[in-house]
Amino acid sequence: MSLFRDDGIVLRTQKLGEADRIITLLTRGHGRVRAVARGVRRTKSKFGARLEPFSHVDVQFFSRGSELIGRGLPLCTQSETIAPYGGAIVTDYARYTAGTAMLETAERFTDHEGEPAVQQYLLLVGGLRTLARGEHEPHLVLDAFLLRSLAVNGYAPSFSNCAKCGMPGPNRFFSVAAGGSVCVDCRVPGSVVPSAQALVLLGALLTGDWETADACEPRYVREGSGLVSAYLHWHLERGLRSLRYVEK
């Protein structure tokens, strides 16, 4: 029997029995963790209010073994709020749909429980904080998060130099299968010809150049979002359900 303490973001919850929930979190030290929180669905439970999606929490787990992830699910025995991002996110449709896509993305990129994913965790914390504060348009925050998540997981797209031969850009064509921008000689069937403005935007989002990103015209933001969605779909092998609501 062991106690573990960590901080994490609540990704989702699901009902268990009459009063309990299974809480899925992305934690700093243990990656994705599923744990049982007992009694949190009772009306008077203050504990349950802290364990809602988007919440940044300090949690204590109880495991029957010497490791957090082992036989059966650990119990979530304590929780303290670090930052209640959900309060500012769920009241705005654009923020909510973008935030939901961010949570789903983080879970998809951390499919093995108990494996630390510190970079993904830090990206999610920063993304939700930015979204909750309303510092930039939700679509831009989401696309920046998606691009950086792809990058930290080894799928960084190229938006200038050729992704196949390295020819200096800008290059005219773009292929999700090839890894981003490609030159004339390296283009493959299915390559598209995006606007230069959309590629500049995506490069800015990937590198954190918010001055350039915030100044981009809406039509190029929409075009860029389409490229990000297609690129993410290719590498995850199936799309995000939550992106359908963002696109609406």
UniProtKB/Swiss-Prot annotation:
Signal peptide: none annotated. GO terms for biological process: DNA recombination; double-strand break repair. Gene3D superfamilies: Nucleic acid-binding proteins, Recombination protein O, C-terminal domain. SUPFAM superfamilies: ArfGap/RecO-like zinc finger, Nucleic acid-binding proteins. Pfam families: RecO_C, RecO_N. GO terms for cellular component: bacterial nucleoid. Keywords: DNA damage, DNA recombination, DNA repair. InterPro entries: ARFGAP/RecO, DNA_rep/recomb_RecO_N, NA-bd_OB-fold, RecO, RecO_C. It comes from the Bacteria. The keyword Lipoprotein does not apply. HAMAP family: RecO. Involved in DNA repair and RecF pathway recombination. Belongs to the RecO family. NCBIfam families: reco. This is DNA repair protein RecO. It comes from Streptomyces avermitilis (strain ATCC 31267 / DSM 46492 / JCM 5070 / NBRC 14893 / NCIMB 12804 / NRRL 8165 / MA-4680).
